[in-house]
C-alpha cells in the first residue's frame, strides 16, 4: 500500500497477489512480504521481507530485511550492495572444500559440497552477497524470492546466471 503511494502507476508482482498490472507496464514492484513463510509459521527465526524494483525488464534495486537480526540488505544497480550501510563483497575462497553453499538440492549433483537448505532464499542470496555463504543453487523458485538477492550478489561482485525475469516461477538460479 505504501509503495503504491509513491509510484501509484507501477505494476506489482508478488507472492500474495500474483501479477497486478497498472498503467505503467514497464515498471514493477516485486514483493514477497515474508520469504521463509514456513520458517516464520514454525517459529524458526530465519525469514525476510523482500522488495525489488524492475524497470524495462531489469532489476534496478532491491531490499531484503531480516527483522530478527535487524539487518537491512539493499542494492542499487551500478551503485553497490550494502548491509546497514556497510559495503558488501562476495567471498573469494579458492577451495571448494572450504566453501558453504545453499541449495534446495533438487537437481544438484555435487554431493561432495558443504550444503545447507535454510528455507529462505532471499536471505541466502543476501548471505552470498555478504560472503557468509559462497554460493546458491536453486531450481523451480519464484521471481519474488530471488529478484532482490540476485541484484545484491551482482552488485557485491558476484555472478548470477541469466535468470528469466519474464517468468514468475520455475526459475533455476545459480549465484556465487
Q: Language-model segments: which ranges?
A:
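Residue-level signal for inorganic ion chemistry
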Residues: 3, 12, 37, 66, ...
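Conserved residues at the C-terminal ends of beta-strands
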Residues: 15, 65, 139
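Acidic active-site catalytic centers that drive phospho-/nucleotidyl reactions
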Residues: 15-16, 32-35, 39, 124, ...
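DPxDG-like acidic metal-binding loop motif
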Residues: 23-82
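Short, isolated positions in well-ordered beta-strands
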Residues: 60, 87-90
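An extended, acidic
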Residues: 89-176
Amino acid at each position: 500500500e505504501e509503495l503504491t503511494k509513491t509510484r501509484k502507476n507501477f505494476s506489482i508482482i508478488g507472492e500474495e497477489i500474483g501479477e497486478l498490472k497498472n498503467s505503467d507496464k514497464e515498471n514493477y514492484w516485486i514483493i514477497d512480504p515474508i520469504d521463509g513463510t514456513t520458517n516464520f509459521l514454525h517459529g524458526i527465526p530465519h525469514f525476510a521481507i523482500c522488495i525489488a524494483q524492475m524497470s524495462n525488464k531489469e532489476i534496478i534495486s532491491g531490499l531484503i530485511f531480516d527483522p530478527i537480526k535487524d539487518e537491512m540488505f539493499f542494492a542499487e544497480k551500478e551503485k553497490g550492495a550494502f548491509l546497514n550501510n556497510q559495503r558488501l563483497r562476495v567471498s573469494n575462497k579458492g577451495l571448494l572444500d572450504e566453501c558453504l553453499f545453499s541449495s534446495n538440492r533438487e537437481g544438484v549433483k555435487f554431493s561432495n559440497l558443504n550444503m545447507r537448505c535454510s528455507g529462505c532464499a532471499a536471505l541466502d542470496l543476501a548471505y552470498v552477497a555478504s560472503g557468509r555463504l559462497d554460493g546458491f543453487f536453486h531450481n523451480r523458485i519464484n521471481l519474488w524470492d530471488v529478484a532482490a538477492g540476485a541484484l545484491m550478489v551482482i552488485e557485491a561482485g558476484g555472478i548470477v546466471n541469466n535468470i528469466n525475469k519474464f517468468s514468475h516461477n520455475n526459475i533455476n538460479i545459480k549465484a556465487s
